């Protein structure tokens, strides 16, 4: 299988008939499977309007936030740079 050096994603957000719970479920599924597509030293560049979802779900799935940038205070948009956490012995 081919593994990626980086994954760049613009995550969906609550709008119209889509509920916040449905968006949370998408984040759960994304963080639950993305490690299978990344090299060990791979990174995720993630654009999000759901800042509160990113850190806890990333940590729960073996990722850490290297950097966080606020893009628009008005729109509540952020870019996160994440990498995988490994136990180094």
Identify the meaning behind each predicted range:
Residues 1-89:
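Class I S-adenosyl-L-methionine-dependent methyltransferase catalytic core
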């Amino acid at each position: 299988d081919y593994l990626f050096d980086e994954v760049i994603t613009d995550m969906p957000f609550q709008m119209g008939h889509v509920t916040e719970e449905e968006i949370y479920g998408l984040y759960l599924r994304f963080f639950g499977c993305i490690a299978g597509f990344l090299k060990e030293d791979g990174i995720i560049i993630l654009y999000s309007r759901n800042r509160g979802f990113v850190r806890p779900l990333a940590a729960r799935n073996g990722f850490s936030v290297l950097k966080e940038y606020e893009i628009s205070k008005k729109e509540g948009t952020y870019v996160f740079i994440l990498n995988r956490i490994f136990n180094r012995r």
